Amino acid sequence: MSKNISTTPPVSCTLCPRRCGADRSAGQTGFCGAGGTLKAARAALHFWEEPCISGTRGSGTVFFSGCTLKCCFCQNYPISAEGLGKEITVEHLAEIFLGLQEQGAHNINLVTPGQWRPWIIAALDIARAEGLRLPIVCNTGGYETVESVEAWRGSIDIWLADLKYVSSSLSAELSSAPDYFAQARPAIEAMMAQAGHPVFDSEGILQKGVILRHLALPGHIDDSFAVLDQMAAWNEADPGCFIPSVMSQYTPFYKAAEHGIGRRITTYEYRRVVNYAMDLGLTAGYMQQKSSAREEYTPSFDLTGI
């Protein structure tokens, strides 16, 4: 169903918690790096998400340019921080969605879409009118407003969200977002209220619900414990309201070494995080293997599919 969403670039952008006020209609770029024309860097089947997302045929993943966070360790930094990507129309994005469906994708996976929300919703409306029937995944770093989550209502089926930090000093240092947890906590609660408990199809592929990810960082497992405490509190209040996913794949990309995290997490550190999660009862989800910290799992941003 069309929402009659305008794709006119915002005059004073408030799409993310930064509310930077960039006049994107005049060609200014926001804090996120996004301007007035939709931009993406890759669209292809992706096989390295959680099994209930990637399945056997892959997740139809579209990587959008720009990001509302500035994570110093971002594995996607060429597109999130350096502006790599190609400008496209809303109509072409709709064609990309339909093409991924034709390739057999289990879902359409929107990676860091928040800065392009009005454009993407319009493209989804066009694609659905032309036969798109797959679940739509919002793959987000968790730095959202409740208003943004609500604006996606009717367009998103699955929230694949990070809960990166609790510590405001750590989120300021590593992602330039001292208010990360203050924004992410209510936003994630809104995601869970909107999507409801997880629903799977006969193949075990998620059709609706929330997957809540946490990437354990070297030297900062105390903050991981705080994140897991918050996850456990949600699970205790409403058992099964999300699928936990604890990840070990941290690799020191981009400017990580400048911020004291220029190494991979040790087996000892990660085992402590996993044990803590299990002790809290966060067992009905995913615990990534330590061997997943490999650079080859990062896709090539070569404009494939764009």
Which sequence ranges carry the predicted segments?
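N-terminal [4Fe-4S]-dependent radical SAM core
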Residues: 1-68, 72, 76-81, 301-303
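Flexible, glycine- and charge-enriched loops at secondary-structure boundaries
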Residues: 86-90, 177, 181, 263-267
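Conserved AdoMet/S-adenosylmethionine-binding subsite of the radical SAM
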Residues: 95-259
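Auxiliary Fe-S-binding modules of radical SAM enzymes
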Residues: 1-29, 197-306
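Short, conserved acidic/polar surface loops in the N-terminal third of protein domains
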Residues: 72-76, 82-87, 120-123, 148-149
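Conserved alpha-helical substructure of the radical SAM core
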Residues: 78-107, 276
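Positions that flank functional sites
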Residues: 89, 115-116, 292-293
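Short Fe-S-cluster ligation motifs
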Residues: 40-61, 95-113, 285-287
